[in-house]
Amino acid sequence: MPIQSSKQHSAAPVAMDTQNDGRSFKEIRQDCLQRQVLFEDPDFPADDSALFYSKSPPLAFEWKRPGELCDNPRFVVGDANRTDICQGQLGDCWLLAATASLTLQKKNLARVVPRDQEFDNSYAGVFHFQFWQHNKWLDVVVDDRLPTVRNKLVMLHSASNNEFWSALLEKAYAKLHGSYESLKGGSTMEAMEDFTGGVGEMYETKSAPKKLFTIMKKALDRSSMMGCSIDISSSAESEAQTSSGLVKGHAYSITGLEEVNCRGRKVQLIRIRNPWGTVEWNGPWSDSSKEWSQVDKADKDRILKHSDDGEFWMEFEDFKSNYDKVEICNLTPDSLVENTPHHWEVSWFEGNWIRGSTAGGCRNYIDTFWTNPQFKLTLEDTDDDDDVCSVVIALMQKNRRLLRKEGMDMETIGFAVYEAPDDVDQLGKDFFRYNGSKARSRTYVNVREVSERFTLPPGNYLVVPTTFQPHHEADFLIRVFSEKKATALEMGSEVDADLPDPPMPSSPDEETEEEKGLRRLFDQLSGSDQAISARELQQMLNGVLSRRKEVKFDGLTLNTCHSIINLMDVDNTGQLEFQEFKVFWEKMKKWIMLFLSFDTDRSGKMSSYELRIALKAAGMQLNSKLLQLLGLRFADENFDIDFDDYLTCIVRLENMFRVFQSLDTKKSGRVNMNIMQFLMMSMNV
């Protein structure tokens, strides 16, 4: 779809209702209150299908409402805060770490966790939460039946036995992705973005900029959400505890950054929270360590006053030595946080990689790389404090958690940025063969989103998002964040045809030897009516083409010959006269040469990825969506198109363009037609 832009300081968009029956949270609650029943969600039933998709539950779970687990259930006790979040049996610590960070952003929290719900007179067993998904805010409704074992919650829960907002939040997020199991394994950044609509950045601590502490401090001051983790070298190391009390492969949230005076020197400290709340750092600056006795009392009282169980301080240099990754989620202009000193300009567009047409793979696959979706980015104004343009480009694949139950997981994705020539549409293979990228994602990786920050001179750029390997399908969203307004345009989006009027056929006494031979064959087949039917045309063309050894094919089908007659039969007799056939044969010879230019191995087939070039050479320009449909219609399982299907495709397209052009008398690109006209046109293609 076309690229969209988000203006600075735009109002927060309204969340879309997601229930299959179209009802909103308020409508469901009101209906249940009137009928005096508790809501049971038909879209996410309280059974094993909501828990696991790949196996049977390891335990006998019972689904119970909060009122069955305690005497005085509350949605939120006091204020929602990071101590309300305790990990359960599910491996979704990444979600817990993001939720802990969310509690520090009260206005964002109020959006994700609306406070218009409680266990009071308005209680009807229904709750709702709001998440950002692929450039839209969604309102997700759930009932309050939660999985338990022996009357205890087994998934995410609060430290307070009668508080349930965090458990219900996890259930709503599981519903969004199809099941609780779909939440196993992930990046803190993924949930941070879903809670804010923000854009993520990732830093490797061992190779981070020297000003990483300043970058993180400014990010926290701007209400950004942050997380960190320690890499693992094998699955056996996952959740393994180090001697210093840190857990590998575990998602932590970053909740504070401070500088303190210690024995006359400035020490940079970072506060980190473990969602488990039990295992903590035991090195320097840990709880009760000797370093705190050497800090100014005012600093110590101020810093330690708000630390909780599972939350610890460490020196920033120790942090960089022990942790491997830092994730920062920057907030977008429509965030609910006010008075932040920096706002982004945002452009975005959606697309997909489809086998046989737009799933070209990375630059390693040069023959198909150019077929990937392309879009042009124009940067005109430099940053206020520099002569370059700062941009963050984020490529996100869509709905992959939801598709896990169908055997699909994250694709390995990345992107490249090229300097774009002026006034050029979709760029072809030779451009990428001879021109290197100006910027690119650091690596291809199988995560939901890959993002990079660049500083580029003003100019025109081409962004090419890809999967690592060709023929891999996925839907994607690209967001471009720039300090100054940028313009973006999808390449290859034009649909047009340059089809000159067919030449006048030569008179009989001016016919070439080839035409005289075709006339003799035509006369043998046509009989007294001097015209041939589709079946006679099939016989004639198969006979003529079989003598051309360079064209390898199994014969034209009757369907193809009907399409040829529909294109060339100007007097609507359902047959071809020889003068009409001569005009067609001139077209046919050009189409044959075009096909052979792509059938380099003379197999009788061409790659469906090259259909865009072939059709453009024949005078027809299609966008990616139409090329995807043609690939699905005419290509085989190896993404090849044989000669008969190629001919059918090109004949039908030319016929459709010519019919449209005859109806578009004002050359406006639009036609109005009634059902009769539409059916007549469809039948004649």
Task: Give the residues covered by each predicted segment.
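A contiguous pocket-lining binding segment that forms or flanks enzyme active sites
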Residues: 603
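Extracytoplasmic Gram-positive cell-surface binding/anchoring modules and repeats
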Residues: 577, 607
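Inter-heme linker and motif-flanking segments adjacent to c-type heme-binding CXXCH motifs
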Residues: 596
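Structured alpha-helical subdomains that flank or immediately precede key functional sites
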Residues: 1-563, 570-572, 578-582, 586-593, ...
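Short, conserved catalytic or interaction motifs in soluble domains
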Residues: 600
